[in-house]
Amino acid sequence: MFARQATSVSAFLVLTLSLFAAASPLGPAPPTTSQCNVGNQQCCNTVQDSSSAPAAALLGLLGVVLQDVDVLVCSPITVIGGLNSACDASPVCCENNSFGSLISVGCIPISL
């Protein structure tokens, strides 16, 4: 009688564990995608590395210390202005990383 109960419990545990294993996700989670809010789009006049002379000079004047980061010297894209509001340079998405509307750091290029 004890052997029969032990066999039933063992079978139940094996079945339960196999169901949990089958229900668990396989592989890594899908990567998250970056989202750009409309207000965070900017039109960059130039895109420069932080080690370039013009970018380093501007960063020095602003007191910003960066290493190995792309610095984007940008002017914002405006919604007002109709056809004249198109970006003819480098459109990017930036979030909370601008310094006095002169430069933005670590922006992501986007296509409009």
UniProtKB/Swiss-Prot annotation:
Quaternary state and interactors: Self-assembles to form functional amyloid fibrils called rodlets. Self-assembly into fibrillar rodlets occurs spontaneously at hydrophobic:hydrophilic interfaces and the rodlets further associate laterally to form amphipathic monolayers.
Similarity-based family: Belongs to the fungal hydrophobin family.
UniProt KW keywords: Cell wall, Disulfide bond, Glycoprotein, Secreted, Signal
SMART domains: HYDRO (SM00075)
Residues modified by glycosylation: N96
Single annotated GO MF: structural constituent of cell wall
Function: Aerial growth, conidiation, and dispersal of filamentous fungi in the environment rely upon a capability of their secreting small amphipathic proteins called hydrophobins (HPBs) with low sequence identity. Class I can self-assemble into an outermost layer of rodlet bundles on aerial cell surfaces, conferring cellular hydrophobicity that supports fungal growth, development and dispersal; whereas Class II form highly ordered films at water-air interfaces through intermolecular interactions but contribute nothing to the rodlet structure.
Signal peptide: 1-23
Induction (free text): A CT-rich motif, which is often found immediately upstream of the transcription start point of highly expressed filamentous fungal genes, is present at the expected position.
Disulfide bonds: C36-C93, C43-C87, C44-C74, C94-C107
Compartments (UniProt record): Secreted; Secreted, Cell wall
A GO cellular component entry from the record: fungal-type cell wall
InterPro entries in UniProt: Hydrophobin
Listed name of the protein: Class I hydrophobin 7
